[in-house]
Amino acid sequence: MIEVRGLKKTFDGFAALDGADLSVPRGAVYGLVGPNGAGKTTLLRHLTGVYHQDSGSVTFDGQPVWENAGVKARIASIPDDWFYFMQAGLRDMMRFYRGLYPKFDQERFEKLREVFALDEKRPLRRMSKGQQKQAAFWLALCTMPDYLILDEPVDGLDPVMRRQVWSLILQDVAERGTTVLVSSHNLRELEDVCDHVGVMSRGKL
């Protein structure tokens, strides 16, 4: 279970988060919507342990995420600005992920080759945004996460690939109890896949 209580974060006097509260039960698909500047990305960066809150708490199954390697190993994240090494290809990043995530499933990586038809040796920086997003999903799903944190996840994907990606995610939810938190501007799409949808405004939910 993801629990956020009274989360506050200020940047140069601006309250990006102003007492945000959130509860996401295990196996749920929770959608997050709101205008630009509402605090969605800032909230997700706290959930993945990138930011540390000024006050409040962020816990996964009762454990804080900040500087907690055990919790972070259970979380896969696809931010809008996905990180990759500049000279790396997909297979290079696979080796990197395999070293980071104890549950990385090599067999699943091979099977998902049928879904994501990408050149694994081509540098990721030479791929389109949509291809990079496919690579991010390919790797994230192979970490066998308990929690999947997604920021505008299918932006840049064609309609067919969007359906395939959501099918894979929802299969993990059904079979493994994966908990998903997804931020998007596309309310219609969230309504199609989410159990719950929360609206962020001025740093609050």
Model-found features: residue ranges?
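ABC transporter nucleotide-binding domains
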Residues: 2, 9-201, 205
